Amino acid sequence: DLGWTVAPGRASANGLYKSSAEGLRSREVGETYAGIADTLAALFGNSFAFSEEVPFDDSLAHHLELDLGAGTRILNFGVPGYGVDQALLRFRKDGRSWAPRVAVLTFIQDDLFRVANVYTFFKVAWGIPLSKPRFVLRDGELLLLNSPTISPPEMFSRASVFDLPLLDLEIEFFPH
């Protein structure tokens, strides 16, 4: 469970974003990357990898394909709002099976803080009621918590925000 991801075979309401049959950013709705014989490279990360706010032909993945030339396809696994933790989980869940020759991780400073969040709605700029997986280090081992994630109905069925599980791991929550 990734918290949220790009749904397969969809287009945004304004038509700017489209996704492939596999849930990757693509030029056309529902196109498939399965069975392509080209050399594959994979792009993981946040809205910069996804190339939010720009059409496909201006996306990072498209420009990488142009720079690398014929015979190379970039699989765009980027998802807006992801931290490096979710990008790693997406690689494990969706990307590894493609056996890309190269995997590229994009990140910005804020992505490093996102690894310490469980709930997105504590970030003032978000306001979106989602939860995400969270890694913690225990006895020298990475342990994945909140997987599967808590759904919005589960979150808002609580009598108080203080009743949410894993609240002690939420760095954006500052009760007064």
Predicted feature locations:
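Loop/turn elements at helix/coil->beta-strand transitions in domains of secreted/extracellular proteins
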Residues: 38-39, 70-73, 99-103
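Serine-dependent acyl-ester chemistry module
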Residues: 109-176
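Structural preference for long, well-ordered alpha-helical segments in enzyme cores
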Residues: 44, 64, 90-91, 143, ...
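Oxyanion-hole/transition-state-stabilizing segment in secreted/luminal serine hydrolases
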Residues: 42-44, 54-60, 88, 92-129
